[in-house]
Amino acid sequence: MRVPEVLIKKIFKIANHYGEDAQVDMLIEEMSELTKALLKNRRAQKGQTDTPVRATVNAIEEEVADVLIMLHQIIYLGDFEDLEDIIEEKLDRQLERIEAEKEQQ
């Protein structure tokens, strides 16, 4: 998902206002909320809660949005230089693992 420039500007403005320490804390909180939403969805799919599955999917979507917003802020505030290269290396490594798995089958 590509984030439109207008949203990036808003994200950066918020990041600049609150600063890195506060936004790292907020990212940790939002990731925790996403974890809880994912677990609740898993329970809903197994019929272990009264919450409808659709409601848990909506909650996951909300929390993913929060985490993505916070990640964009941390990336911006952290001024990481090698992030794209690291991501590409990790993706390539996983694709190599997938190919190796296919060869073993």
Language-model features, listed with the residues they occupy:
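Flexible "arm" and connector segments at domain edges
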Residues: 1-105
